[in-house]
Structures are given as structure tokens and as C-alpha cells.
């Protein structure tokens, strides 16, 4: 897959709630800097975390508005629409990706944390 294909698949699998397929897009030694979950190293750590997404969110959509690809790197501006514990979440976000051998080796996401506060506190 090309970098663009991997990034498209990242959002397709997330929006389908297919977190196993989503995790398959990452290298075993992946590093993620996630706005809410913090610094996450290794696919072995990430995969069980993502297994809980279906329980944490009754609805989760992360829709890309603009994607830029430069070789093995990409960035996306997205909009998140989610529902957790009866609370709707709407937030704009930015994602940065570095790929190695056709898989995501590093990613970071940045977004306003205020819309997620009721979920994080409850």
C-alpha cells in the first residue's frame, strides 16, 4: 500500500469500528502521542487499549477534511463526532503520521480536550 492508501485505511477502519484491522496498520514498535491517552509505545500496548473503544464510545467517527502526503509522511485535518456515556463529542483534530515499510511507525494527534472532559471525568 502507498502512504495515501494506509492513511485512507486508517480512517476507514476507525470509522467502521474495526480496531483490529486499524491496529494492523501499525509497526510492532510503533510510537503514538495521543492527546488523551498520552505516549504509547509498541503495538502490544496499543492493541488491548483499542479493544475497549467499542465499549467506550457508542459512536465514533473521525472524518478527514484535508490530507497531505509527502513520501512516507502524512498529515490530516479531521473532525471527530462521537458519543460516550450519553454525551456527544464534536472536535476538530490534526493527525501526523510517519510510515516505515508501508505501516505507521509514528503518529500524533492534536485536538481540543474540552469536548472530551465529561468522558474523561466520568
Residue ranges and their predicted role:
Residues 96-118:
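Short beta-strand edge/turn micro-motifs at domain boundaries
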Amino acid at each position: 500500500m502507498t502512504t495515501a492508501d494506509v492513511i485512507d485505511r486508517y480512517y476507514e477502519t476507525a470509522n467502521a469500528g474495526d480496531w483490529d484491522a486499524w491496529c494492523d496498520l501499525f509497526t510492532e514498535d510503533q510510537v503514538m502521542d495521543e492527546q488523551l491517552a498520552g505516549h504509547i509505545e509498541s503495538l502490544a500496548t496499543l492493541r488491548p487499549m483499542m479493544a475497549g473503544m467499542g465499549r467506550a464510545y457508542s459512536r465514533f467517527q473521525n472524518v478527514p477534511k484535508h490530507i497531505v502526503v509527502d513520501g512516507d509522511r502524512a498529515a490530516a485535518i479531521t473532525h471527530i463526532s462521537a458519543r460516550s456515556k450519553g454525551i456527544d463529542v464534536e472536535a476538530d483534530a490534526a493527525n501526523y503520521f510517519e510510515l516505515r515499510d508501508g505501516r505507521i511507525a509514528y503518529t500524533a494527534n492534536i485536538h481540543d480536550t474540552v469536548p472530551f472532559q465529561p468522558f474523561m471525568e466520568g
